[in-house]
Amino acid sequence: MCGIVGYVGTQQAAPLLLEGLRRLEYRGYDSAGMAVCGPDGLRVQKAKGRLQALADLTDEGKAMPGVIGIGHTRWATHGEPNDTNAHPQVSESGRFAVVHNGIIENYAELKKKLLEKGYTFRSETDTEVVAQLLDWYYRDSRDVFEAVTSMLSAVEGTYALGILCADTPDRLIAARKDAPLLLGYGEGENFIASDVTALLRHTRNVVYMDDGELAVVSAVGIRIYDERRRPVEKERHYIDWDVDAAEKGGYAHFMLKEIFEQPTAISKAITGRIQEGRVVLSDLTMTDREIRDIGRICIVACGSSYHVGMVGKYNLERMLRRSVEVCLASEFRYSDPIIGPGDLVIVISQSGETLDSMAALREAKKRGARILSIVNVVGSSIARESDDVLYTWAGPEIAVATTKAYSTQMVVLNLLGLYFGDIMGTIDLETYTAMVQGIQALPHQMEEILSDTGYIQAAARELAGHDQVFFIGRNLDYALSLEGSLKLKEISYIHSEAYASGELKHGTISLIEEGTPVIAAATYMPLFDKAMSNVVEVQARGANVLALTTAAGTERMHSRVKNVLTVPETEAMLLPQLGVVPLQLLAYYIALERGCDIDKPRNLAKSVTVE
């Protein structure tokens, strides 16, 4: 959601803050601002809309001299998007500037008390309460650290905070609770940020803050304190990401670039994990006995990661002969789940910071379940709190609509199923071998799909003018349809829903009329005849069908459907890995035809870190 960047060192802060904020644009925002301490004291500039408005207002930061500052891109939660509600929020005295990601749940109560003490408020935000509260405590103590500590004791809710005080222009203070925040270590300069991509051009050495921690950041060092305000030493993580991976590299959009990066991303995800035809997951600490003794398996995730989990349910049940449940993290945490010792909860998250997934993890852990996470960001909160973690190694994913993270999550989940199935003795050698060989072939097969996109672009032009598109599919094709539908609505703003084909007669078919676009996923050949029957069924009501199938089904599908998207043959459980690529491209080209902001679709954020 909101993006935070802070800098203290010897360089001019504002241009660096703008650069960092640009690298956080993908998180979603509606306004931006910066605060810098310089020769003229504490200066703040804010602007509604795109970050370029702030850059123009400050002459790319040159109009705000100073070597220490904080910046923020805001996603409105309290108060409408405007200059006044943008961050940084400043205390009435002008002494404190605060940037904040999260929600202060008791802000109304605190605001009432501050009003009674004579404070006035300019904004509608909960964050202004933090700034005013700091000022109140500072009046008594004249000690910034003590004021921050008192403020943190008073507020309830979630927060990642960057704090700048005009009286101490050589240091920043950072604090975290249930919202991501990290510290970057440089040479004669140090940083704070909500996401490592903001810092990659300046440092690869970072420390991820844990809940309840507070950090004092100066040019000469960083001091970290735990919840009881005792100094702590923390392990630094080296982020081995290619800086250029966070650039477009000649592509029109990050999303298109990341679609085309999927073959390489899959290759990285499986490197070292398949050896001499066997799956080897040396990352795991689970013993063979612990694996054999697994009871229930529950996959917990949000958004596209949830769709990965749906594919995982089908595949893990086939490979492990265990019941697998897949739950939305936002529902799991409130559902009083039947989970406990001996059960395995698999948490899937690209960022490793998704708030609902984090809360679900903690709920499952509290009940005694073992936690295994599949995440992309090394050292992220979910990774740190899991018993085991499998990294996807997808590298930075900038577009809001996920592509390569989805694909790498799925391949890692399939590897996990093979690894467990081998140890449990629940998967036959023929299936195991076919799956391993199929996974190794995925990068080449994806490249084959990506080598010819002209017919997908043509199909996109036919669909771009419609206001709604339906997806249908059975079994794995239903899970695939859900992801295809989500991609389309995310970036093209076309109303789209995915339905299990067998449910058409239970109400959905009433929505089909003359010319209604229906995308029929029919890659799973054991159910191909049923898929064809559903195609005929919707065509009889006037639907204009676009089909997705394998090379084996193309000729038969063409007998009924003009436009057919084709993927290569592979093991049945791997078909969603290939089928998603043409659906990603279709969504991209439709959004392009409609002139949409593909990388930063309206009202969406890359990482959802508030409820």
PLM regions and their residue ranges:
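Glycine-rich, anion-gripping cofactor-binding loops and their flanking helix/strand elements
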Residues: L182-Y208, S330-K365, K505-E537, E571-Q584, ...
